[in-house]
């Protein structure tokens, strides 16, 4: 192929007779043989040789610039696609690495949680065994109580290196650790102190040489052959010695050389047998502890369990286990003897005690409980707990303010102990549980375990829960002033300012549109009042209910069936009668099922006792001359139904004898009984089982009074606004309060602490919650608000 130079048409590579494609896309003919430039015009065409017609139908040829341009374009596209591919590949690799790491993290988390669960189960079994022994004096048969085993440790045991290499590596590591400890100033004298603690724990005197203990006594200590007399002596040891034992157990991992030195007198066969037993029981958990940092970290979190467990006496705890603490160090491959400098050791001991005193408060959470346990074990017997009434806690006065404490001591009241005794709510067994300081472990359970009856109240655990809104009752047109539950059925009655009462069956629900709660439609509406309904009471059998209104009447109703048809015809027999005697609004009602009597208090200043079944239902009238003011609330005394308590707008509350109509005790919060408080009382309730009265005040306070002396035993600011309503659960464990700050608060009557706060209603005209109630037999609570809603919580 010849290379020809072209003129205006450019260069071309082609057979001379064929046309060629220039860079610009124009066809050009090759120049003549004489090298004259071909202009691509007609003269050049004439000299081209063959005619042009058949030449145009042949395939077009490419020029070098066009080919280079195409190659460069394709190469750029290929490089771009390759770059995109590499980016996608890197992203996918990063995604794969992230998912692998996430999977590995989840597996590690799962293993750690499984390990913790096993350790918690093991610790709980130990605590139950100790509790059973402390309560009944006998060992609890739980089978072979073994430390939990983990898969990683089993594989490590299976792949154990030869003993000689392991011993050599262990020696080198120990020497390196000694060098590091010397560099940071942690000398052998500290180890000497640790050695001395081991000797004191074994009962050896300081003057005895190392290894001089008799083999028989040592074997008895190590293998658990301890007599009951020795156990009793250990329980009566001074608390200081036991606390030293706790300090040792907190900080020291036992010295392997000292342990091996002390068991030299044990026969070889028994030693091997004991080591074999250790391996079976623990599966290398203690021996390979340093090889598995996760296991070591998990075990460190349970140091407080070891401390509490060894509180009964270090010797007893050492001798009664499976030999874990001793056998762990028996596996050490070497043994050394440390010389103890008694003078230096005693100085370091004193210095250590001083340091521990400074750290003791923040070091151990359960330290106080352990000290209380030691003190209680030193006494001849546990504090006596009276069987019907609460006992006084030794630490109750220290938990109160000086002012309130002085009042409590004057009145000798039935206090709510918040300390060691805790016998207001709990029985003697719960006192023992709190003394042991189990903390959260006391609530843990292990499946397939023996069920020990601790004589706890039946409904105590049922109430230890979080209440959540479940039902919303929306059919009233004005504020809901009062509500009450049926004694047995899941049925609620509400009284409203819209002049009506409504009956609700909580089992007939309608799903709400935009809420997790359920709407309930009323199944019956009571209509007889000609004004707002202010108060409500239901009989103990649930067959009648009573309502008091601003029209000064008390309406007596027969309760319809919970399964009544809401669209049934009107039944006139539902309204059983009307009790007329008051001349102003009836603000409070209370019913007693013992004598089927009804109490009412009115704005006319009187409190009236009714027996609705009689022809003249009004039995007696109290405070007829308004000598104490205007009554605001009334209730029967729970532990003495022959008495009732009434609160007044003057800030005082009076206990009346229903038989004699005489006032017995005035409950006043003032130090000087001649002065009366101006704090308006909105609600008064009586504790169901104790001689205690609780009042809710306009000044945001809730106050507790002793019914026998009339003295206030506790006072607390309970809400951010006026406290309007109170309710005590049927077991007397919890108190519920409602306020105009839109919140419901649940209080533990033992500790006077708020267990839960619920924001339930909205404000309307600066008022929010009017009433709260517990269901007598089911897990329901309810609240009534000024926003025309009633809410039920489960």
Swiss-Prot record:
Chain residue ranges for the region called Calmodulin-binding: 164-181
How this chain sits in the membrane, per its record, is: Peripheral membrane protein
Swiss-Prot/TrEMBL WD repeat ranges: 475-514, 528-567, 581-620, 676-715, 718-757, 764-794
Q: Where is this region: Caveolin-binding?
A: 70-78
SMART domains, alphabetized: WD40 (SM00320)
Cited CDD domains: WD40 (cd00200)
Which Gene Ontology cellular-component terms appear in the entry? dendrite; FAR/SIN/STRIPAK complex; Golgi apparatus; neuronal cell body; nucleoplasm; plasma membrane; postsynapse; protein-containing complex
Residue spans making up a coiled coil are 76-135
The record's function comment reads:
Calmodulin-binding scaffolding protein which is the center of the striatin-interacting phosphatase and kinase (STRIPAK) complexes. STRIPAK complexes have critical roles in protein (de)phosphorylation and are regulators of multiple signaling pathways including Hippo, MAPK, nuclear receptor and cytoskeleton remodeling. Different types of STRIPAK complexes are involved in a variety of biological processes such as cell growth, differentiation, apoptosis, metabolism and immune regulation.
The name of this protein is: Striatin-3
């Amino acid at each position: 192929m010849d290379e020809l130079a072209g003129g205006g048409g450019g260069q071309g590579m082609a057979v001379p007779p064929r046309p060629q494609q220039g860079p610009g896309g124009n066809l050009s003919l090759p120049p003549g043989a004489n090298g004259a430039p071909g202009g691509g015009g007609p003269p050049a065409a004439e000299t081209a040789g063959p005619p042009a017609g058949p030449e145009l139908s042949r395939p077009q040829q490419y020029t070098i610039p066009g080919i280079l341009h195409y190659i460069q374009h394709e190469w750029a596209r290929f490089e771009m696609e390759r770059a995109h591919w590499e980016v996608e590949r890197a992203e996918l690799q990063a995604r794969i690495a992230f998912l692998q790491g996430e999977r590995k993290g989840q597996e590690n988390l799962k293993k750690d949680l499984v390990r913790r669960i096993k350790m918690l189960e093991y610790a709980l079994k130990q605590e139950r065994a100790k509790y059973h022994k402390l309560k009944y004096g006998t060992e609890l048969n739980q089978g072979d109580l073994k430390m939990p085993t983990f898969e990683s440790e089993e594989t490590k045991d299976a792949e154990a290196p030869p003993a000689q290499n392991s011993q050599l590596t262990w020696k080198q590591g120990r020497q390196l650790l000694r060098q590091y400890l010397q560099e940071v100033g942690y000398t052998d004298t500290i180890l000497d102190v640790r050695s001395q603690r081991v000797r004191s724990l074994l009962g050896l005197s300081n003057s005895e040489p190392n290894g001089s203990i008799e083999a028989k006594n040592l074997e008895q200590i190590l293998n658990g052959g301890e007599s009951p007399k020795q156990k009793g002596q250990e329980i009566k040891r001074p608390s200081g010695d036991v606390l030293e034992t706790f300090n040792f157990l907190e900080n020291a991992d036992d010295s392997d050389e000292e342990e091996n030195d002390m068991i030299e007198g044990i026969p070889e066969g028994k030693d091997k047998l004991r080591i074999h037993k250790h391996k079976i029981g623990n599966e290398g958990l203690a021996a390979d502890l340093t090889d598995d940092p996760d296991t070591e970290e998990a075990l460190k979190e349970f140091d407080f369990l070891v401390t509490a467990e060894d509180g009964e006496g270090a010797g007893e705890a050492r001798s009664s286990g499976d030999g874990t603490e001793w056998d762990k160090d028996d596996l050490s491959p070497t043994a050394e003897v440390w010389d103890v400098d008694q003078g230096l050791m005693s100085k370091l001991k004193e210095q250590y005690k001083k340091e521990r005193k400074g750290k003791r408060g923040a070091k151990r959470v359960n330290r106080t409980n352990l000290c209380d346990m030691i003190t209680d074990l030193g006494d001849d017997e546990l504090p006596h707990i009276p069987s019907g009434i609460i006992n006084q806690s030794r630490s109750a006065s220290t938990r109160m303010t000086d002012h309130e404490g002085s009042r409590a001591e004057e009145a000798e009241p039935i206090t709510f102990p918040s300390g060691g005794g805790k016998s207001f709510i709990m029985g003697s067994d719960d006192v023992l549980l709190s003394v042991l300081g189990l903390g959260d472990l006391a609530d843990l359970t292990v499946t397939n375990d023996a069920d020990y009856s601790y004589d706890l109240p039946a409904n105590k655990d049922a109430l230890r829960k979080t209440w959540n809104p479940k039902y919303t009752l929306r059919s009233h047109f004005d504020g809901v002033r009062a509500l009450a539950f049926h004694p047995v059925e899941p049925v609620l009655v509400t009284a409203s300012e819209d002049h009506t009462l409504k009956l609700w069956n909580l089992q007939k629900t309608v799903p709400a549109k935009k809420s997790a709660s359920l709407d309930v439609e009323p199944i019956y509406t009571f209509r007889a009042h000609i004004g707002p309904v202010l108060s409500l009471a239901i009989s103990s059998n649930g067959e009648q209910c009573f309502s008091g209104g601003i029209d000064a009447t008390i309406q007596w109703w027969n309760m319809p069936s919970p399964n009544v048809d809401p669209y049934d015809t009107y039944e006139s027999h539902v309204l059983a009668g009307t009790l007329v005697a008051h001349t102003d609004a009836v603000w409070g009602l209370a019913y007693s099922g013992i004598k089927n009597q009804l109490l009412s208090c009115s704005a006319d200043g009187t409190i009236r006792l009714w027996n609705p079944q009689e022809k003249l239902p009004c039995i007696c009238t109290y405070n007829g001359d308004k000598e104490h003011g205007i009554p605001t609330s009334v209730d029967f005394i729970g532990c003495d139904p022959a008495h009732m308590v009434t609160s007044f707008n003057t800030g005082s509350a009076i206990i009346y004898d229903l038989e004699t109509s005489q006032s017995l005790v005035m409950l006043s919060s003032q130090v000087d009984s001649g002065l009366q408080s101006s704090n308006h009382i909105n609600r008064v309730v009586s504790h169901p089982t104790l001689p205690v009265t609780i009042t809710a005040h306009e000044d945001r306070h809730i106050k507790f009074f002793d019914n026998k002396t009339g003295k206030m035993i506790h006072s607390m600011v309970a809400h951010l606004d006026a406290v309007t309503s109170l309710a005590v659960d049927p077991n007397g464990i919890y108190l519920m309060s409602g306020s105009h700050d839109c919140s419901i608060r649940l209080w533990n009557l033992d500790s006077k602490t708020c267990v839960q706060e619920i924001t339930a209603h909205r404000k309307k005209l600066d008022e929010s919650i009017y009433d709260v109630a517990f269901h007598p037999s089911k897990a329901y609570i309810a609240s009534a608000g000024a926003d025309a809603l009633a809410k039920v919580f489960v």
